[in-house]
Amino acid sequence: MQETGQGYANLDDAVQSIRMGTATILIAPGVYRQCTVQAGGNITFKAVQPGTAIFDGEACEGKAVFVLRGLSSVVDGIVFRNIRVPDGNGAGIRTEMGNLTVRNSMFLDSQEGILGGQPTGQKIVIERSTFAGLGTCDDATDCAHSIYLANQGSVTITRSRFERGRGGHYVKLRVPNLSITDNSFDDSAGRKTNYMIDLSEGGTGLIARNTFADGPNKENWTGFIVVAAEGRTYSSAGLKVVGNVATLPPNFGHSPAFVANVGSDRIDIGANKLAPGIRAFEQR
């Protein structure tokens, strides 16, 4: 515990000691087969050295390594890998309550990276993190995704990398406000993947300065960014898509839409650098 200097044998003991307080838990280098449930307070989970605190294979409540339902949570420098649970939604992080910031972290070879849904004005920020080998449509009744988040607040994803998807979408959001900027989506080694970004129920904000490289082994190749495919809960008016780069694999043989809109709100599509064969817009 950074504030007190007290050490704990396992992570959950440290978390439970905080109760409704505020604390930073410093996690020493190592491979941990542990998980924890945060039920209150404001907790920062921080690796002493980024990338050296590795949580491998253990999920609490059949959900995730970190099940977060406190006042707020920060996850900094942690690696989550090999998370699988019977319902197909095994995640590094399950956010159920409270604002969440994730930075400098890695989510590897699991059913899901970050999963959460709550009917509040929650703010989620994900930055400088890696999502690889995630997603499945084989283990779950519904597909699992690298990131799958729903709230009535906002989601920001920036300076992060998505690669080697194993099913589902790379980013699936059901939120009114979003910012997805300066990320890399590399599907070249993906398999059974779908959209890069699925804004299932609409939403507005900014998608800018991302690089998208489509791969040859997609389950659904028809769009990179798809808006309101499942409903029009949130307005997409003014959603700005600008300054992105998108490419196709050699001899792809398909012509996907860069942005496909199932809703009726006007999306603001600016200048994007699209490889031959990619259609800028499709109204569905």
PLM region spans:
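Leucine-rich solenoid repeat scaffolds
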Residues: 253-284
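Extracytoplasmic/periplasmic, Sec-exported soluble proteins
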Residues: 6, 67-70, 94, 202, ...
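Extracellular beta-strand-rich solenoid/capping regions of secreted or surface-exposed proteins
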Residues: 16, 20, 32-46, 54-76, ...
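Acidic Gly/Asp/Thr-rich repetitive segments characteristic of extracellular carbohydrate-active
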Residues: 1-28, 33
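Right-handed parallel beta-helix
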Residues: 28, 42, 46-53, 71-82, ...
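Extracellular beta-strand/beta-solenoid scaffold signature
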Residues: 57-66, 86-94, 109-118, 138-150, ...
